[in-house]
Amino acid sequence: MRKKTVQIMISHSLMIGLWASAFPGIRAGLEGYTPEHLALFRLLIGSMALLLFAVLTQMRLPDLKDIPAIFLLGFLGFAFYHILLNIGEKTVSAGVASLLVTTAPIFSAMLSRLFYKEHFGFTKWLGSMISLLGVLLIAFGAGDFTYSMSGILVILLAAFSESIYFVFQARYIKKYGFIPFVTFTIWGGTIPMLVFLPGLGEEMMNASISATLSIVYLGLLPTVIPYFALAYVTSFVGASEATLSLYVTPALALIISWLWIGEIPTLLSLLGGVVTVGGVCFTYLKVNKMNKIFITHFSAKRVKKL
């Protein structure tokens, strides 16, 4: 039991650390590559690593009827998401980008309400409004409002694209398993990205070694390993608890960005980030039933006295 607990803690650490490091890694990669080539190079490396893994584990391929949907989810969750995130990070700092991406759970909740009629109560709407206020604070704190706002909107669109991937993946994860599904969707996201292949070789020749190594790191580690770690943790504690620790990611991303690329966000941007993450957390706040009973009882008592 203790060994399993240690393994879960290590998995959580891998998820938080690797995903947090991806944001400054993108900024470092953009020093030598365009957003499109960076996304393609990163996904190619991840796809090749997963291809080797699939061969070694004799992974079963998806049914033909599921391939169009899996490829579409791969395009939205990986290709489109990474291109937009890379474009956004041209004008938005790595730390702020990581804070903006935490809005994905709110978009997921809204989509679940729209397509699956899941409950989207008052706390979720209020949390969404709080997060929107945080986004505005981030925009004002970034300096040139018009310049930074375009990058912020692009990253929010990336978060929305990723939320579509999260909402509609359930049936395929249930059918194929988490790791095979992630493998298939990364492949599905890589194939349409091949349209950007022309010019990649030339950029590799001209880019600095540090920029290229940053993308190799992104492709081998943050693109692949955290998903496997998430699958491992989910198998023991469930998806909700497994993803809960990901709210720590922006805080660590800010620290890594400072140490890796010397990026220091403004105080107003940090405040906006705290408000944004707070809004996301508030969106998923669950009021304890006993607290409801206590509040009702206390209110009734007070009315009686009056």
From Swiss-Prot:
Domain spans labelled EamA: 17-140, 160-285
GO CC term (a single one): plasma membrane
Cited SUPFAM superfamilies: Multidrug resistance efflux transporter EmrE (SSF103481)
Major location (coarse): membrane
Cellular compartment(s): Cell membrane
Ranges annotated as spanning the membrane: 6-26, 37-57, 67-87, 91-111, 125-145, 148-168, 177-197, 213-233, 251-271
Disulfide bonds: none
Annotated InterPro entries: Alkyne_AA_exporter (IPR052756), EamA_dom (IPR000620)
One Pfam family it belongs to: EamA
Keywords for the protein's UniProt record, in alphabetical order: Cell membrane, Membrane, Repeat, Transmembrane, Transmembrane helix, Transport
Membrane topology of this protein: Multi-pass membrane protein
Keyword Repeat appears in the UniProt entry: yes
Claim: Repeat is one of the keywords in the record: yes
Protein family (similarity comment): Belongs to the EamA transporter family.
UniProt name for this protein: Uncharacterized transporter YdfC
